[in-house]
Amino acid sequence: MKTIVCYGDSNTYGYNPENGFRYEYEERWTTILQKELKDSAIVIPEGLNGRTTSFEDELRPGRNGATYLDPCLHSHGPIDLVVLMLGTNDLKIRFQATPTDIGKGIDRLIKMIKSITPQKRQDGQSAKILLM
């Protein structure tokens, strides 16, 4: 069985803007993906509202995606695929991030995935990465 980690922000979390809570479990895209894949893979949703690629948010601590990625990958290994859905929150005015800054944040996460995931796999290969 394959392991897929979906690492993202509120879209991965399943945030429902209509009520400020989460969509029901059955309505979240990660659950729908799991149902489509059936027993061929396990889908692990790792979403957090407001998560950034690598920016510290003084208004919402704990949202730096680079900080949590390391323990996340170690706790879920071995991982076959990481679906990376981050960058939208980097556009917040308070970060004053340029497209280059956001790209560097994504690049940092990709390098972390390529560095950490082979340590948890018997074949020593990096997990595949799907950047959304």
Predicted features, each with a name:
Residues M1-L48, S54-L59, C72-H76, V82:
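Serine-esterase "nucleophile elbow" of acetyl-processing enzymes
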